[in-house]
């Protein structure tokens, strides 16, 4: 029996869903994504994060260290991904950590006073301009701490992980949106995610064992019928 005046305590939206919608706006602003598709991608990316972090913490244990570094996450990413995906994921992680270190070395300067006379340009180089991350490293750090590993976690390692997760999501979303556009739709459905993974060799090697609800089956064409 439902009581009047009481609101449901069930949460239908997760933080990952917000990040996924922000990514799809960057990739293809004309496309939207179904709620079920968001749930599928959230589950995929959580499993990937757990696999990467389990391998990274295992490397920390083997090296007798107490702090998880970006290098440990990088090695784990290379072990958990394949081919061009691995190469681009490592590249994105390195760029994110470089920007993070540059921001620490060159903090933003306060604006000059209006009464100050114009002076020559400063000799201090400006940090590289980069887009702000979609997935904040603080959110990932909170989730990784819930894995109950008794190790310290550096901020650079979470920046690296954030870049890798964003790259993997962007790859799947880009292929899924292309499939939806080819089918003359603007809504990304689970079928589009399934075909995006099934038709890509590297994504299929990583997620081919995953069952996607509502994804259907891969179409088979008999070459003798043509």
Swiss-Prot record:
Molecular function per GO: DNA binding; protein heterodimerization activity; structural constituent of chromatin
Region (Disordered): 100-130
Cystine pairings recorded for this chain: none
Spans traversing the lipid bilayer: none
SUPFAM superfamilies listed in its UniProt record: Histone-fold (SSF47113)
Sequence ranges of Low complexity compositional bias: 114-123
GO cellular component terms listed in the entry, alphabetical order: nucleosome
Family the entry assigns: Belongs to the histone H2B family.
Name of the protein in question: Histone H2B.v1
Organism: Dictyostelium discoideum (Social amoeba)
The encoding gene: H2Bv1
């Amino acid at each position: 029996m439902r009581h009047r005046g009481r609101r449901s305590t069930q949460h239908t939206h997760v933080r990952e869903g917000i990040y996924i919608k922000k990514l799809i706006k960057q990739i293809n602003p004309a496309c939207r994504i179904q709620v079920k598709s968001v749930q599928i991608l959230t589950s995929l990316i959580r499993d990937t994060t757990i696999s990467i972090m389990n391998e990274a913490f295992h490397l920390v244990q083997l090296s007798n260290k107490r702090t998880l570094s970006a290098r440990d996450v990088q090695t784990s990413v290379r072990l958990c991904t394949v081919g061009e995906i691995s190469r681009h994921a490592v590249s994105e992680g390195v760029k994110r950590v470089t920007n993070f270190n540059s921001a620490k070395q060159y903090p933003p300067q306060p604006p000059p006073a209006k009464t100050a006379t114009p002076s020559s340009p400063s000799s201090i180089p400006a940090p590289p301009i980069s887009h702000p991350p979609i997935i904040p490293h603080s959110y990932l750090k909170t989730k990784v701490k819930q894995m109950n590993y008794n190790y310290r976690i550096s901020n650079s390692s979470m920046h690296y992980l954030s870049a890798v997760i964003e790259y993997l999501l962007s790859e799947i979303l880009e292929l899924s949106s292309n499939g939806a556009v080819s089918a003359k739709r603007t809504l990304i459905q689970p079928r589009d995610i399934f075909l995006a993974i099934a038709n890509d060799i590297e994504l299929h090697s990583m997620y081919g064992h995953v069952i996607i609800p509502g994804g259907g089956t891969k179409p088979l064409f008999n070459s003798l019928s043509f």
